[in-house]
Swiss-Prot record:
One of its GO terms (biological process) is translation. HAMAP family: Ribosomal_bS18. It comes from Acinetobacter baylyi (strain ATCC 33305 / BD413 / ADP1). GO terms for molecular function: small ribosomal subunit rRNA binding; structural constituent of ribosome. One of its GO terms (cellular component) is cytosolic small ribosomal subunit. Keywords: Ribonucleoprotein, Ribosomal protein, RNA-binding, rRNA-binding. It comes from the Bacteria. Belongs to the bacterial ribosomal protein bS18 family. PROSITE patterns: RIBOSOMAL_S18 (PS00057). This is Small ribosomal subunit protein bS18. Coiled coil: none annotated. The keyword GTP-binding does not apply. The lineage of its organism: Bacteria, Pseudomonadati, Pseudomonadota, Gammaproteobacteria, Moraxellales.
Amino acid sequence: MARFYRRRKFCRFTAENVAYIDYKDIDTLKQYITENGKIVPSRITGTKARYQRQLALAIKQARYLALIPYTDNHK
């Protein structure tokens, strides 16, 4: 039987040597938001705590400035 190994999580921001997560970088921020608009936790994404705090702040700033929606599904 074939065994499925879970891919090791790593922090993309550490690997790319990012100094600051910008709230205007919408494409990056959307990767860390669910389809309901919630911020994905670091235990799922593998983001380090320092960058997770910056990420949450950047997402909240972008939401406040209406760059990204609070929720995607309005039914």
